[in-house]
Amino acid sequence: METAEIVKIAVSAAPYSIDKPYDYLVPPELLETAVPGVRVTVPFGRGNRTSEGIILTRTPGEKMQGLKPLLSVLDRGPVLDGDGIALALWLRQRYFCTLFEAVKAILPAGLWYQIREVWHVAEGMDRCAADGAATGIRRAAPVLDALFAAGGSAELSVLEEACGKEAGTVLRALQKAGVTVCETAARRRIGDKSRRMVELAVSAEEAASLTEKRSSPQRREAVRLLAAEGRMSAAEVCYFTGVSMAALRGMEKAGIVAFSAEEELRLPDLTAVEPSGPIVLNEEQEAAFQCIRTLTKTGKPEAVLLQGVTGSGKTQVYLRLVQEILSRGRRAMVLVPEIVLTPQMMRRFSACFGDQVAMLHSSLRMTERYDQWKRIRRGEVQVVLGTRSAIFAPLKNVGLIVLDEEQESSYQSENPPRYHTRDVAKYLCARDKSTLVLGSATPAVETAWNAEHGIYHKALLRQRYNRQALPEVLVADLKQEIRAGNAGMVGQVLRTELEENLRRGEQSILLLNRRGSNRYLLCGECGHVPECPRCSVALTYHSANGRLMCHYCGHSERSSDTCPVCGGIMKHVGTGTQKVEEELHDLFPGTEVLRMDADTAAGRHEQLLDKFEREQIPILLGTQMVAKGLDFPQVTLVGVLAADLSLYVDNYRAAERTFSLLTQVVGRAGRGGSAGRAVIQTYTPENDVIQCAARQDYQGFYEREIRMRQLRRFPPFADLFTFTVSGTEEGAVLRAAVAVREELRRLCALPELAAGEPEVLGPAPAPVMKLNNRYRYRCLLVGKNDRPTREAVSWLLKAFANDRANRGMNLFVDCNSME
């Protein structure tokens, strides 16, 4: 029996339905470089199309007939180690993605290769000879037409566009017949940057002697500089001495200097910060710190909820914990939910830990993210600070992971793998026996439930750091504004408070709560909002058919212009920041308003916030990004323009999100020496969520919400699997969704699933039913996220993809989606 080296490969071209580690043969010329963790190119599928992959394992084995060989190795060394490969396998099993999708999530985007196949007509082959050799090859003529029309050479993508997807199969058949040849090239999106360095190749005395007589003054000056400074960049030598690069090359030929290349890291521009003094904690912070510090010493994986009111100084506790972890020779990771929060947090951490901190988030240039990743991988940093994807940073010996504002939905990925950062952090802490700190003033209901039942530990910060009182909150009834004939977004109560702040010269923040852009109906008299009788979520208004629909169970009813409760007029709710900005300019002529939303703030978050603080602009108007983590001492007033916009959307998390958002934004006021005030404008002032937020009463909100979730079997009492079917023909998509529902019901009757009393709902239109010309319907499985359920879900996804009736349609699944 002949033996050989066999590798298992995660192949990029493998869809989920056939995804697995594929076996390939290592050819003799690649034995030294084909090791686990390197990217490779491989032939894949019947047409042996060149595809990218990554080696997962390598073992000696039997050389089986038909086993395909690797084509090439793309990396000089592994880009994933054993821990990274294990994480990719876990992501695949947990989130129903392919192995390669998991690997791509872990590695930085700039590291990926673009595989290009260029096809040529074989040397000496004219069209007549090509036609003769291609006899019997199906559809060879149009492919040859396109190839010869392109001058005898073209990329596969160009030929596929002209002749269809089967062009690759035809070209390979022509290759076997000797008509065509293929040239494959792998090009990385970004490369390493280096700079040319120069140094003396001989002693300073000898160099001076060689340049003393016949050399120019610039050459002699270059020798003196290099003798004094040692190795320098060639550009610097030219700049300081006036010597030309050509002259330096001449000195190299003469043996006086030597050139070399040195890696140059592309690091983000950060505002310089002064080193901070000792971190001083108050009594309450010290108690929380000591509680968590004790957990970090157990040598076991631990999770703790650090719950503190807004302004209580949770960041100070994070800093002290990181300091403690670093003193023990371990490393730390601190994550924030929004890019807008990273600059302020980065300044505070850099002041404490200097260049030991690396920052990772999507607003950095791809080259900057890649170079930060390299620093982390080489062990040059001790602390990683970033947004969601920073959880995959290759940081070793991690002793602490912090998720600030852990309740935020931005911690969940919307693309495969659809992971939640909190779950990945728990996996890493279990692997590394480290501590996970979940920080929030308004923790997710599931997190609070886990802390209440002893699954997580809990530390509390009940007071603000400076002992300042929480802001006084006024709840303004917008129904009164309608009755008074005020159709604008700024009511009389808020207008009065803004006038007072302008008179005092203090700053204000206004939040337009635009989350959940779906329109809903609301009675302008009594505040009634039509809800689904089955799901306890607000019904969404569809203007196309004039109906109210539930996007969970599919319930539908005709909309009415009159309120079924009091007979009042039903109002369509929804607006935008630009309109509010215009209204503010009309109300307060000459007052500067800084608008910050997804459009105006793209890539400019830090500049806008710096301008607000530095220039003392009176009013900052924005969406959710102004609600969290910002600390401006001169802000004494916060206004919420329409609290209801996120409260009445068809999502079981609507109440939790609204309470969290209101609590967070109210907490932006009064963080300096002056008392803070807040105005919450709402059409439903008596709503329990609004009232709890006005009182900053998390416990009251939690007790109400947990009762509702237990009644409805929402998390944490069950897990919700959302199956979304999409396609270009609505009727076909709906039929496929019905088939998915029936298959789910059959699976739920199996003994291993039936014990959990699963329930199947739907199909119903997705909240955005048509996206990119694809219709979307979804079904819900209410059950338990355990191994039998995940295996059943995986089987269903593969069966759907392999069913020819579903050609042109996609099915994907989320578990406990935040959206």
Model regions and ranges:
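Accessory, non-ATPase domains that flank or precede helicase/AAA+ motor cores in DNA-metabolism machines
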Residues: 1-440, 452-468, 782, 787-819
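Small-residue-enriched segments and motifs
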Residues: 4-9, 24, 53, 473, ...
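Residues at beta-strand starts and edge strands
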Residues: 5, 20, 38, 330, ...
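Short, intrinsically disordered low-complexity segments
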Residues: 39, 756-785
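Generic structural signal for residues in well-ordered beta-strands
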Residues: 180, 257, 357, 475, ...
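Inter-lobe coupling/hinge segments of SF2-like helicase ATPases
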Residues: 272-293, 298-734, 767, 778-781, ...
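Extracytoplasmic/periplasmic
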Residues: 731-746
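Short beta-strand elements
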Residues: 747-766, 807-814
